[in-house]
């Protein structure tokens, strides 16, 4: 088609429905005299008519769900990595707790049976027994590991026993989780003879020290 592009533009304007009466008359006169433009115009008109008459194709019911269900599932390792990237603080805290627990388990399993006592001068050590003498008040918390504690006096604080028991004059005291103001202890009595209790005790004391600053 060797005619001016102006007529081609007029064809598009006509098909869009925006042509003026003057331009429409001008295009009509040209199409009557130009067979090539007339053929091109009919092809454009037919194409648009076919496109408008074509039915809209819709996907069958459940098509999207079926496609999503057939997609390969995401590996769990990828999910975990994404979660770790989105929660760096929780990840660091979890790693710290795992390492801390591992170190405490190692300490528990490889520790010797040697008696360990907190450093109050008022305490007396007799073999595997730590004695709070009668009439004596021991200030602060008392810790005894791999031994027993005989209470004849008073402890002005908490008492914690690892791998041992708390004694009074005549019998063993059940100190687990007990709060006492009678029997020589003005604080919390706690006996620890299992690994997980040991881990929890250290974690609790660690965070208690952190939040005390």
From Swiss-Prot:
Gene3D superfamilies: Anti-sigma factor, zinc-finger domain
Superkingdom, natural source: Bacteria
Membrane topology of the entry: Single-pass membrane protein
Cofactor: how bound: Binds 1 Zn(2+) ion per subunit.
GO molecular function: metal ion binding
Claim: Zinc is one of the keywords in the record: yes
Keywords, comma-separated and alphabetical: Membrane, Metal-binding, Transmembrane, Transmembrane helix, Zinc
Spans through the membrane: 88-108
Subcellular location: Membrane
Positions in the Extracellular compartment: 109-213
Annotated Zn(2+) binding sites: 30, 34, 37
Post-translational note: Is processed by three successive proteolytic events. First, the extracellular region of RsiW is cleaved by PrsW (Site-1 cleavage) in response to cell envelope stresses. Next, it undergoes cleavage at an intramembrane site (Site-2 cleavage) mediated by RasP. This cleavage uncovers a cryptic proteolytic tag with conserved alanine residues in the transmembrane segment, that is recognized mainly by the ClpXP protease, which completely degrades the protein in the cytoplasm and leads to the induction of the sigma-W-controlled genes.
Residue intervals on the Cytoplasmic side: 1-87
InterPro entries found in the cross-reference section: Anti_sigma_zinc_sf (IPR041916), Znf_put (IPR027383)
Cofactor dependence: Zn(2+)
UniProt cross-references to Pfam families, sorted A to Z: zf-HC2
GO cellular component: membrane
Function: Is the anti-sigma factor for SigW. The presence of RsiW leads to the inactivation of SigW, and its proteolytic destruction to sigma-W activation.
Family to which this protein belongs: Belongs to the zinc-associated anti-sigma factor (ZAS) superfamily. Anti-sigma-W factor family.
Name of the featured protein: Anti-sigma-W factor RsiW
Phylogenetic classification of the source organism: Bacteria, Bacillati, Bacillota, Bacilli, Bacillales
Gene (name only): rsiW
């Amino acid at each position: 088609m060797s005619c001016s592009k102006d007529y081609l533009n007029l064809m598009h304007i006509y098909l869009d429905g925006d042509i003026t009466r003057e331009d429409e008359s001008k295009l009509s006169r040209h199409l009557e005299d130009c067979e090539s433009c007339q053929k091109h115009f009919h092809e454009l008109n037919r194409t648009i008519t076919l496109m408008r008459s074509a039915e809209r194709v819709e996907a069958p019911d459940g098509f999207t769900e079926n496609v999503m269900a057939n997609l390969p599932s995401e590996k769990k390792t990828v999910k975990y990595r994404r979660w770790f990237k989105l929660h760096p603080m929780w990840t660091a805290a979890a790693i710290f707790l795992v390492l801390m627990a591992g170190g405490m388990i190692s300490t528990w399993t490889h520790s010797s049976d040697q008696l360990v006592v907190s450093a109050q001068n008022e305490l007396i050590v007799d073999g595997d027994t730590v004695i709070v003498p009668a009439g004596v008040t021991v200030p602060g918390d008392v810790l005894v590991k791999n031994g027993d504690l005989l209470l004849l006096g008073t402890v002005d604080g908490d008492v914690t026993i690892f791998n041992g028991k708390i004694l009074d004059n005549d019998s063993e005291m059940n100190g687990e989780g007990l709060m006492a103001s009678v029997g020589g202890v003005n604080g919390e009595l706690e006996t620890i003879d299992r690994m997980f209790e040991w881990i929890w005790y250290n974690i609790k004391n660690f965070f208690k020290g952190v939040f005390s600053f």
